[in-house]
Amino acid sequence: MLQDRGFQVKTGTIVDATLIGAPSSTKNADKARDPEMHQTRKGQQWYFGMKLHIGVDSQSGLAHSAVVTSANVHDKHPLPDLLHGNERRVYGDSAYASQKALIQGKAPNALDFTNQRTRKAGCEVDEVQRAKNRNKSKIRARVEHVFAVVKRLWGFDKVRYRGLAKNATRAFVTLAMANIYLARGPLLQQVRA
């Protein structure tokens, strides 16, 4: 629908992932947690649930690909499924920093614009690299807008069903609604014209 209205995937992709919580309680009929959900640590905080990985167009800010995994899967593993192959630039946080070969394999013309680590063991902070990362993060912020709509506006910050399959379907529908919501201005202008 959006491609019919002139919205198309351009030449850049921003990749990122977010945690979607699941109940870790065993106070249910089965006396067990959901076997497809797992726990992971982010900083010093532990989470139980799944991850929603998305690829967002760097110009329009609309999601074009998504993968759902359990929370213990590292962000780099679903990276090939998030790229469409025609990218000229790939943006990501430092979780994707060492994936240059994987990016080149899926999108041969793509330049790697992932944030690099600024602190090496026993070394000073690299201020030049920190400034480069800050500029890349201004573009990467577009993926966070999609997550904000999915989690805050549509309420998908916790899973509703057991298992990844049903929750993946809900995630994909929510992303489709988020795309329509984020593109509402130009879509309404076309309708009014």
Question: Regions from the language model: what does each represent?
Answer:
Residues 163-192:
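C-terminal extensions of enzymes
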Residues 59, 155, 181:
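Residue-level marker of positions within ordered structural domains that often coincide
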Residues 130, 153, 187-193:
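A short, flexible helix-boundary coil/loop motif
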Residues 79, 87, 128, 150, ...:
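Generic structural signal of hydrophobic/aromatic residues within well-ordered alpha-helices
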Residues 1-108, 115-117, 172-178, 193:
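Polybasic low-complexity intrinsically disordered regions
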Residues 88-89, 94-169:
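Helix-centered, glycine/charged polyanion-binding patches within enzymatic domains
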